C-alpha cells in the first residue's frame, strides 16, 4: 500500500543509529535469535519518546532488555520503566545487561 510505504520511508528517515552498547546488544540478540524490536520501530519509539516525554512506562516482555535500555537512553532523565518477563531464563540476562549499561 502506498500510504504504508510512505510511512515506512518516513520512519526509516528518522534512524539516528544507536549507542555502541545498544549496537552490541542488538547484534548479540540477533545472533542468539532473541526477538527485539525492528529498526523502524526503534526509530518510531525514539520519536514517540521525544514527543510525549513520558514519566512512566510499563513494558511487557523484557527479553534481553534491549527495548528497555533504548527507552532509558532516549527517554527523559526522570523516566521510570517497569519491565516484566515471564521466561525465567531471560531474566538474569536482562539484569546483567542493565548492570553493564549502568541502568540497574
Predicted regions span which residues?
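A short alpha-helical cap/connector motif
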Residues: 1-104
Amino acid at each position: 500500500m502506498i500510504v504504508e510505504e510512505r510511512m515506512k520511508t518516513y520512519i526509516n528517515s528518522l534512524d539516528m543509529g544507536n549507542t555502541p552498547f545498544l549496537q552490541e546488544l542488538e547484534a548479540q540478540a540477533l545472533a542468539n535469535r532473541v526477538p527485539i524490536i525492528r529498526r523502524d520501530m526503534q526509530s518510531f519509539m525514539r520519536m514517540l519518546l521525544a514527543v510525549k516525554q513520558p514519566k512512566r512506562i510499563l513494558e511487557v516482555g523484557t527479553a534481553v532488555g534491549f527495548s528497555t535500555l533504548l527507552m532509558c537512553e532516549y527517554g527523559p532523565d526522570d523516566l521510570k520503566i517497569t519491565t516484566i518477563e515471564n521466561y525465567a531464563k531471560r531474566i538474569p540476562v536482562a539484569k546483567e545487561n542493565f548492570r553493564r549499561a549502568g541502568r540497574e
